[in-house]
Amino acid sequence: MVRVTNAYGMPVVAVVGDGQLARMLQTEAIELGVEVRLLAGTDDASAAQVVHDVRLGDYTDLEDLRRVAAGADAVTFDHEHVPNEHVQLLLDAPVDPVPVEPRPQALIYAQDKLEQRRRLRELGAPVPAFAAIESAADADAFWDSVDGEVCLKATRGGYDGKGVWFPASKSELLSLVEELDAPLMGERKIPFDRELSAMVARNRAGEIRAWPVVESIQDGGVCRVAISPAGIPDELARECRELACRIAEELDVTGVLAVELFEAGGEIRVNELAMRPHNTGHWTQD
């Protein structure tokens, strides 16, 4: 059922998040005849400066989420940090439930890196060796298992190089585990020739479309340049797209999925998943 609340008969999409991605989404929404309603932390946030209907609130507050979602045709996000249990409650509301894209059953795999790794391994997707790090003993054992090639990650909340550490010694790893007040995981550090991104879009009916695979030039963990199409062999590009499509299907992702990849010697490994507009996709606006 489509619930149109806009006075001009336009469908309304509630966007949780007020950053650059939400701002760019607003530009595309105008061309599609969709009205954006924004949940923003401040009225001078990037997206709040260009969206007409702005509701100030906190994305971790269930009542603020309900307020921005009320009467909308769909709810989506420009980041993955909304509490998953709140997203589920929006879907399960006994009165006027709201479609949420992506659904919480998929979103969890973009929110929690350890759950993501476990699920991708179940699917047979190429991922680095990894382990939960819940104690010094876990850290010690993982260091030895990967010959000291350790990337330590916060399982939640990290992005753009934040929440990632590369300890130079076992003692540094043990100190980090003791100091950091966050759930952690370890991954084998992967040498790579380039970073790639395979972006796809999937609708509720399961139809999927893929964009060309992009090479991402990073600086300090932040994408500075996206080269599309990536200068890689056609067979490798096809492998990247097919992997992204399979992950979207298996996780039942709706909306946009970006699969960040490391490539070395023609072999790929999944780095991260993002279920939202992605920095490597800005070029699609042009």
Question: Model features per residue range: what roles?
Answer:
Residues 21, 80-82, 155-157, 201, ...:
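Short glycine-rich anion-binding loops that position phosphate/pyrophosphate groups of nucleotides
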Residues 54-59, 131-135, 166-169:
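Short acidic-hydrophobic, aromatic-tinged amphipathic segments that line or gate anion-handling sites
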